[in-house]
């Protein structure tokens, strides 16, 4: 018999459908939406999860398969990034008639604009045959609903910088940087301040890898007494 329903899906506005997957639009890390779609007594249990690579997508599919070991058809689809190449797209009908499950799921996932995302739809047969068209509609609808229940985020790269400031000036410099950022004068954020005996190191982030603008900002505040040093970058999640 089918497991109990996962409960009502949480509704989120759907974004405009782009011509191709947005490489920055995905699911929030840790979000695992789940829905139960019942059609003619068959249950289609859909789950989705962030997957940044094929290994993560396959591990998620295996975990869902283990969760429902008595299910007949855990069908799947995923789109994951491939550095320097087009995204990797895979789907599986897992025993359903060819083209009735995995491919419709993949097409639905593709049209959502999401990437780095895996979906598994597990069917528990209710005794009534749905036919080829019915299966296509059911797997497509289950995928649509679970993606609608997901928390979407847009990934953006923040570039890290450090600036060494004399202790006597560090408090003022930090305050001026924060105030200017709050006014929208620049996108430079103060993430942390490490205090030493004679100097403090400000950990800063910005949207640009170019040091020109941040150098100008620091020069104006410190009378040319501080220059930024690159400290790498990180990817952060912003609400989509």
Residue ranges and their predicted role:
Residues 67, 108, 120, 173-180, ...:
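Generic non-transmembrane alpha-helical segments
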Residues 11-12, 177, 187-212:
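Non-DNA-binding regulatory cores of transcription-related proteins
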Residues 34-39, 149-154, 187-195:
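Short, flexible, solvent-exposed loop/turn segments with mixed acidic/basic and small polar residues
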Residues 49-52, 163-167, 203-208:
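Short beta-strand-to-loop capping motifs
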Residues 101-149:
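Active-site beta-strand/loop microenvironment that shapes enzyme catalytic pockets
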């Amino acid at each position: 018999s089918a497991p109990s329903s996962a409960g009502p899906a949480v509704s989120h506005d759907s974004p405009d459908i782009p011509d191709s997957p947005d490489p920055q639009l995905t699911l929030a890390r840790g979000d695992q939406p789940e829905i139960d779609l019942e059609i003619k007594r068959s249950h289609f249990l859909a789950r989705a999860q962030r997957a940044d690579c094929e290994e993560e997508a396959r591990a998620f599919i295996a975990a869902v398969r283990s969760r429902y070991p008595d299910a007949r058809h855990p069908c799947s689809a995923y789109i994951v990034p491939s550095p320097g190449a087009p995204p990797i797209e895979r789907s599986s009908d897992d025993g359903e008639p060819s083209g009735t499950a995995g491919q419709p799921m993949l097409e639905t996932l593709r049209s959502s604009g999401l990437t780095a995302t895996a979906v598994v739809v597990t069917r528990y047969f209710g005794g009534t045959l749905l036919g080829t068209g019915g299966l296509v509609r059911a797997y497509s609808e289950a995928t649509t609903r679970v993606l609608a229940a997901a928390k979407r985020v847009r990934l953006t790269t923040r570039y890290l910088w450090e600036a060494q400031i004399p202790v006597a000036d560090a408090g003022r410099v930090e305050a001026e940087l924060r105030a200017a950022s709050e006014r929208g004068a620049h996108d430079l954020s103060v993430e942390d301040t490490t205090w030493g005996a004679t100097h403090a190191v400000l950990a800063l982030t910005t949207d640009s890898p170019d040091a020109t603008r941040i150098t100008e900002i620091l020069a104006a505040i410190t009378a040319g007494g501080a220059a930024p040093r690159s400290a790498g970058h990180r990817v952060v999640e912003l609400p989509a």
